[in-house]
Structures are given as structure tokens and as C-alpha cells.
UniProtKB/Swiss-Prot annotation:
Pfam entry (one): cNMP_binding
Positions on the Extracellular side per record topology: 118-123, 192-200, 274-296, 319-328
Region of interest (Involved in subunit assembly), ranges: 45-90
General function of this protein: Hyperpolarization-activated ion channel that are permeable to sodium and potassium ions, with an about 3:1 preference for potassium ions. Contributes to the native pacemaker currents in heart (If) and in neurons (Ih). In particular, plays a pivotal role in maintaining excitability and promoting rhythmic burst firing within hypothalamic nuclei. Exerts a significant influence on the configuration of the cardiac action potential waveform. Does not appear to play a prominent role in the processing of acute, neuropathic, or inflammatory pain.
Name of the protein in question: Potassium/sodium hyperpolarization-activated cyclic nucleotide-gated channel 3
Keyword Ribonucleoprotein attributed: no
UniProtKB keywords: cAMP, cAMP-binding, Cell membrane, Glycoprotein, Ion channel, Ion transport, Ligand-gated ion channel, Membrane, Nucleotide-binding, Phosphoprotein, Potassium, Potassium channel, Potassium transport, Sodium, Sodium channel, Sodium transport, Transmembrane, Transmembrane helix, Transport, Voltage-gated channel
GO BP term, example: regulation of membrane depolarization
GO cellular component: HCN channel complex; membrane; plasma membrane
Subunit relationships: Homotetramer. The potassium channel is composed of a homo- or heterotetrameric complex of pore-forming subunits. Interacts with HCN1. Interacts with KCTD3; this interaction increases cell surface expression and current density of this channel. Interacts with PEX5L.
Gene label: Hcn3
Region described as Interaction with KCTD3: spans on this chain: 353-779
Organism: Mus musculus (Mouse)
């Protein structure tokens, strides 16, 4: 104690002994104990001092801003004087909670007791009134020692003189009138049995003064200590702030309406009772003067609610003037409360789900926009589906929200929302966390529908994409298509080479992607050169797999590597990229995929555009290498190609065919443009799946069949000879039992029995003897 008081005396008194401490030492000692008198024991002094001071918690930190500010406020309480209570202390919080419950009880019980009970000297009634009067008087005394929050200046008055002056000017008179101990007076003087009727009515009038305690309740609702109590209950029930505040507002509104109905019902009976129930009042007309108080209260409450809700007058219309004025007053109060209730309820409902309301308003504008431009029904449906998948019924201004946050908090939110992308992407799993954060903070969320071309071959690349969910196809000219799924990325090649797109990427399902612009891409890679080398390695491997090269990437790869750890990471990324390409290759190609809004009928023909002459020669070679009549229907893709070739026969420069040939048609051994070599011991099968798609595959030769050569009259076909043979005849070898050609699919691509199919004809009159592989339709 003395050591704490010595530094406060000043630098010149640092050497003063403890017995020569200045007279201010007792005050300093009292301040050190939290403003509690020194006569109290040391442990109790410290406990009481802690209860009277603000504690460090979420609410105090939100009010004062920091731990240091809370400590300064505690020092202010210690130096303010003895028994000064801080308004944000624990003691004041619990005291206000007790007073709040007691006030609510008085606001409900006192009107009923004053109105419907004549004998008020029963023990329960006396105990309740005495207890209430005691707490109200104690609250009146404590208000002189409790700090006052000045809302205008955002400060707290703790000086005793300032507290006293301000309290006397504001709420002292109301609290004094509402705290008059009428029951104490009746008990001590014992005047209640000898009071005549006039004095008894006067005593009842004094009890009505207790209604002014509603002003104290309103004052408590305005103070932040009640809000602090609500916040603590939020943390207990693990509620969000919006939900908890909305629920509390609903209960407050409903409770206020019921309390006003309760008061109005008591007032409807109190006025006739003070007039000794005249003959024209509603109580006398209904003969309820001597009924029980429960029945009287029920009829009075029904009459009051009928007036307040403006649905009638109750059991009968008012007759006397007091009843008429009470009815008008009830209607005015009820209409006001009803309007307030509707307004608050509407605002509350709108605030509960503002994001969904914004989405609905936005979509109404979109519907009006589509109607104004008279968009077709298919386009409207695609727009509707896009909004459903993009926003999912809620709309936020995410850029504005994230822009208002601090950088660490923004990075934390982005890392949390993109945690699924990071978990499924090896590029981020093996990368520096700083690189991952730098990339994630610059990503932009996008949604694509089935059939959308995310990337178009030959266009200038300005973005690269990371796949969060969805399935996409990479369509490269003259190469097998590659499929990408969750955790993959694409579009980085043109950003690295500053060139054009080397392939097209089409969305097969609804895809949720994150895009990275070229400026952000280069800015991130400048900070992390190791990751640039990893991107270049994967890009070169992808180009190598589709049979393309890039001199810029090769030149960059020839430069020495800055470290050995990067090579290991590059190997992991390349291996995972290859494994993923092989893993998704077996997926069903028709999983919701659409091309320009139409289903793909024969997918191997929609990959790389070829010249019509080349396609004609390929089909012609396939037809000449069959061993029997072609078991394909006239509507099959091969027959359609043959017809298209016959129409364009003789043209020196045929246009591009609007379909794409599969990789095996484009690169098979029959696609030679100079001379047809002797085919190996393999058989060409054109199989038609259940969905109507045709696939060409190389299988082994059938039992007993071997490779054959062209006859003496046969000649090789090339792209410069766009003619088909007139007739194709086989060796008549029987088909294997149980082959796919014996089962007819329901898709309409039916193979007619041998001998009924007319051989395809051409402008060339001479027949060609078939030699080589056999083509059959497996259905």
C-alpha cells in the first residue's frame, strides 16, 4: 500500500519514509482497493472493487476499444471516490437484471390488484408490495452512486457531484414518485382499517402512480447494459447476431402489444369502479358487479382487444360518456400499435433474408429485360438456369464486402471459401502457401453451362481457369479429346507464350470455375519464378500429348533450373496431370454435354475438321476393306458421309465438313494420302453404342480370316481422288454367331440382313475387289 502511494507523491518525495507519507495516502489506498472504504477487510475490499469496475470481456472491448482503455476506465473508477459504481460493471448488470424482472412483475400485477381487488391486506400481496418498495428505494439510492453514460459526448460521468447534478435534473422525480412506500405507511401507522371510503380511494389513486415506473423501463431499454445482456445470451445459445436480434425484436413487439391490451382491459374496469358502477356503464348493464375478478378481467380484456383491433365494441356498444371516451382512446391506441406492429414486422421480415430479397428483385429485372427484347424460350430457360446455378437464390455484393475488410481477414475468408479448390488441386498442395494466398486473392468466380465454349481455339487468351466442380472437354484439331475435372486447370499456355489458344475447351456439365486474368497471372509469377517453371513444364507436356510444340516454351525450358526442389514438384504435377487425363477418359461422353444446344450424335466426328476429299477417301478405303456387305443402316454416320462425298465428288476444292473426325479415323493406317499399304492383322470395327454414337476401334482379326490384298483391278485412293467405288463385294465369309450385328438397337440405326442392303454406288463404273480389314457394326 505504501509502496504504491509513494510514487504518486512526486519525484521529490521518492526518499520519504513510509511513516512520513502525505495525508493523501489514505485516499490513494482507497483508490487502490477499487473505491471501497478502508474499514472493510482486505479480501472483501478487493472483491467489491472488482465488482464495481468494468471487466475485460467482449462487450467492454467493443465499447472502449482495447485492453488499455479498459484499464484506464478501471483507474478512473478507483480514483472517483468510495462506492462509485461503473455502469458497465458486473454488479450493475446483475442489479439491472433484477430490477427489470421486478418492474415487469409490477407492471402486470399492480394494475390487476388496484382494479379488481378490494382487500389488499392479504399476506402474499403485502409481501410482494413490501419487497418491491424495498428494491425501488435501494435503486433510488444506488442511482446517486452509479456513473451516467452521456450519449451526446460519448463519455461516462464518474464524479459524485456530476452524477448527483445530472440525476436530479432527469429521472429523480419520476423514480421518487414511483417509489413512495405506501404499504410501509399503512403497516406502520395502521390506518387502513379506519380509513373511510374517500381516503381509501385516495390510496388507490396513489397506487396508480406506480405506472410511472414504465419510464424507468424505457430508460433501461435505451442503455447498452440491456444490449450487453442480450449479447451474452446470444453467445450462450450460439446464435448469430442477426437471428438473435430479430427474435428479440419480435418478442419485444409482441410483449408490448400484450402489455398494452392488459393495461387497457384494467382501465376499462377501473373507470366504472371509481364511479361506483353507474347504471349506464358496461359492468352494470352486464350485471357483473358482484362476479369474480377472473370473469370481470376476462370481459374487460375482451372489450379492450375488440376496441384496439377495431373489430367491434365487445358485448355491446358504449352508452355512457365515460365508456364512449374510453372506447375512442382504445381505438386510437390500438390503431397506433397495429400500424407500428405491421411496420416493424415488415421491416423485420425483410431484414431476415435481405440477400434472397435482392436476388428476387434482380431476377425480376432480368425477366423484364428478356420480355423487352423478346428473347426465345430456349434462351430464357438457359438464363434462368444460369442464375440458379450462379447465385443459388442469394445475391451478395462480394467485392464490396471483401474490399471493406482488412487484408488478413480478407485472406482468411478467401482461403476458407476456396478450401475445396485447394484440397483437390496438386498445384496448390505442392506450392508455397504465400503463392496459394496470392493466387486465391486474385481469383474471380464464374459459372458455365453445358455446351458453353469456355476457351475457343485461335482466340487471344486473357484468362486461365481453375476447376472447382464440373467436367470439361479439351477439343484439339486432329488429336484425341482430353477431359478435365475437379482440381484441374487450363488456359495457361497462351498466358505463358503470349499467343493464341491452342485448343478449345467445352463445358460438358455445369462448371464452377475460378478465373485468373493475364495481368494477375504475370504479377504472381514474377514473385514466384519457381511456379512459372512448373506451369511451363505442364504446358509443354500437354502440348506434346496433342502433338504440338511451342518454341518459346522450349527455349525457356532449356534454361537452367534455379533449384532441385522445383524439379520434384514439376514431376509431381506432370504425373498427376497425366493420371487425371487418363482417369476422366473413361467417363461417359454424353453426361449432359451439348454442343450449341443440340445433343452430340456421333462424338468421334466432332473433333477436328478435315477436307471433304480426305473424309471421302477415308470412307472409301473403309468400304473397300470390308469382307461382305456393310451392315449399316442408310442413316448411319458412315453412310451419311458417303452420300456427302458423292455429292461433292469431282470438286477440286471441297469445303470443310461441318463435323470432326475422330482420332482413329484421322490417324488410322487407312488414312494414307499416297498409297494404301498392306494392313496388319487387325480388323476395323465401326461400333454403334446404345446412345447412337459411333466409335471406330482396331481389334484383332476374326477366326479363320486373314489379311487380304487389293486385286489387280484395285487401285489406291488418295485425297486428290474424291471418288467412291461403285460396288463392294466380299468373300462371303459367315459372321460369327452372337456378334453384335445380330442384335438390333432401339436407336433406329438398324442393320439389314446380308443380301438386302444395296451396295453403295458411285460415278466410277468399275468394281473394286475388297481386300484387307473387315468393318462390322457392333450394336
Amino acid at each position: 500500500m505504501e509502496e504504491e502511494a509513494r510514487p504518486a507523491a512526486g519525484a521529490g518525495e521518492a526518499a520519504t519514509p513510509a511513516r512520513e507519507t502525505p495525508p493523501a495516502a489514505p485516499a490513494q489506498a482507497r483508490a487502490a482497493s477499487g473505491g471501497v472504504p478502508e474499514s472493510a477487510p482486505e479480501p472483501k475490499r478487493r472483491q467489491l472493487g472488482t465488482l464495481l469496475q468494468p471487466t475485460v470481456n467482449k462487450f467492454s472491448l467493443r465499447v472502449f476499444g482495447s485492453h488499455k482503455a479498459v484499464e484506464i476506465e478501471q483507474e478512473r473508477v478507483k480514483s472517483a471516490g468510495a462506492w462509485i459504481i461503473h455502469p458497465y460493471s458486473d454488479f450493475r448488470f446483475y442489479w439491472d437484471l433484477i430490477m427489470l424482472l421486478l418492474m415487469v412483475g409490477n407492471l402486470i400485477v399492480l394494475p390487476v390488484g388496484i382494479t379488481f381487488f378490494k382487500e389488499e391486506n392479504s399476506p402474499p400481496w403485502i409481501v410482494f408490495n413490501v419487497l418491491s418498495d424495498t428494491f425501488f428505494l435501494l435503486d433510488l439510492v444506488l442511482n446517486f452512486r452509479t456513473g451516467i453514460v452521456v450519449e451526446e459526448g460519448a463519455e461516462i460521468l464518474l464524479a459524485p457531484r456530476a452524477i448527483r447534478t445530472r440525476y436530479l435534473r432527469t429521472w429523480f422525480l419520476v423514480d421518487l414518485i414511483s417509489s413512495i412506500p405506501v404499504d410501509y405507511i399503512f403497516l406502520v401507522v395502521e390506518l387502513e382499517p379506519r380509513l373511510d371510503a374517500e381516503v381509501y380511494k385516495t390510496a388507490r389513486a396513489l397506487r396508480i402512480v406506480r405506472f410511472t415506473k414504465i419510464l424507468s423501463l424505457l430508460r433501461l431499454l435505451r442503455l447498452s447494459r440491456l444490449i450487453r445482456y442480450i449479447h451474452q445470451w446470444e453467445e450462450i445459445f450460439h446464435m448469430t447476431y442477426d437471428l438473435a436480434s430479430a427474435v428479440v425484436r419480435i418478442f419485444n413487439l409482441i410483449g408490448m402489444m400484450l402489455l398494452l391490451c392488459h393495461w387497457d382491459g384494467c382501465l376499462q374496469f377501473l373507470v366504472p369502479m371509481l364511479q361506483d358502477f353507474p347504471s349506464d356503464c358496461w359492468v352494470s348493464m352486464n350485471r357483473m358487479v358482484n362476479h369474480s375478478w377472473g370473469r370481470q378481467y376476462s370481459h374487460a380484456l375482451f372489450k379492450a382487444m375488440s376496441h384496439m383491433l377495431c373489430i367491434g365494441y365487445g358485448q355491446q356498444a358504449p352508452v355512457g360518456m365515460p365508456d364512449v371516451w374510453l372506447t375512442m382512446l382504445s381505438m386510437i391506441v390500438g390503431a397506433t400499435c397495429y400500424a407500428m406492429f405491421i411496420g416493424h414486422a415488415t421491416a423485420l421480415i425483410q431484414s431476415l433474408d435481405s440477400s434472397r430479397r435482392q436476388y428476387q428483385e434482380k431476377y425480376k429485372q432480368v425477366e423484364q429485360y428478356m420480355s423487352f427484347h423478346k428473347l426465345p424460350a430456349d434462351t430464357r430457360q438457359r438464363i434462368h438456369e444460369y442464375y440458379e446455378h450462379r447465385y443459388q437464390g442469394k445475391m451478395f455484393d462480394e467485392e464490396s464486402i471483401l474490399g471493406e475488410l482488412s487484408e488478413p481477414l480478407r485472406e482468411e475468408i478467401i482461403n476458407f471459401t476456396c478450401r475445396g479448390l485447394v484440397a483437390h488441386m496438386p498445384l496448390f498442395a505442392h506450392a508455397d502457401p504465400s503463392f496459394v494466398t496470392a493466387v486465391l486473392t486474385k481469383l474471380r468466380f464464374e459459372v458455365f453451362q453445358p455446351g458453353d465454349l469456355v476457351v475457343r481455339e485461335g482466340s487471344v487468351g486473357r484468362k486461365m481457369y481453375f476447376i472447382q466442380h464440373g467436367l470439361l472437354s479439351v477439343l484439339a484439331r486432329g488429336a484425341r479429346d482430353t477431359r478435365l475435372t475437379d482440381g484441374s486447370y487450363f488456359g495457361e499456355i497462351c498466358l505463358l507464350t503470349r499467343g493464341r489458344r491452342t485448343a478449345s475447351v467445352r463445358a460438358d456439365t455445369y462448371c464452377r470455375l475460378y478465373s485468373l486474368s493475364v495481368d494477375h497471372f504475370n504479377a504472381v509469377l514474377e514473385e514466384f519464378p519457381m511456379m512459372r517453371r512448373a506451369f511451363e513444364t505442364v504446358a509443354m507436356d500437354r502440348l506434346r500429348r496433342i502433338g504440338k510444340k511451342n518454341s518459346i516454351l522450349q527455349r525457356k525450358r532449356s534454361e537452367p533450373s534455379p533449384g532441385s526442389s522445383g524439379g520434384v514438384m514439376e514431376q509431381h504435377l506432370v504425373q498427376h496431370d497425366r493420371d487425371m487425363a487418363r482417369g476422366v477418359r473413361g467417363l461417359a461422353p454424353g453426361t449432359g454435354a451439348r454442343l450449341s444446344g443440340k445433343p452430340v450424335l456421333w462424338e468421334p466426328l466432332v473433333h477436328a475438321p478435315l477436307q471433304a476429299a480426305a473424309v471421302t477417301s477415308n470412307v472409301a478405303i473403309a468400304l473397300t476393306h470390308q469382307r461382305g456387305p456393310l451392315p449399316l443402316s442408310p442413316d448411319s454416320p458412315a453412310t451419311l458421309l458417303a452420300r456427302s462425298a458423292r455429292r461433292s465428288a469431282g470438286s477440286p476444292a471441297s469445303p470443310l465438313v461441318p463435323v470432326r473426325a475422330g482420332p482413329l479415323l484421322a490417324r488410322g493406317p487407312w488414312a494414307s494420302t499416297s498409297r494404301l499399304p498392306a494392313p496388319p492383322a487387325r480388323t476395323l470395327h465401326a461400333s454403334l453404342s446404345r446412345t447412337g454414337r459411333s466409335q471406330v476401334s482396331l481389334l484383332g482379326p476374326p477366326p479363320g480370316g486373314g489379311a487380304r490384298r487389293l486385286g489387280p483391278r484395285g487401285r489406291p485412293l488418295s485425297a486428290s481422288q474424291p471418288s467412291l467405288p461403285q460396288r463392294a463385294t466380299g468373300d462371303g465369309s459367315p459372321r460369327r454367331k452372337g456378334s453384335g450385328s445380330e442384335r438390333l438397337p432401339p436407336s433406329g440405326l438398324l442393320a439389314k440382313p446380308p443380301g438386302t442392303v444395296q451396295p453403295p454406288r458411285s460415278s466410277v463404273p468399275e468394281p473394286v475387289t475388297p481386300r484387307g480389314p473387315q468393318i462390322s457394326a457392333n450394336m
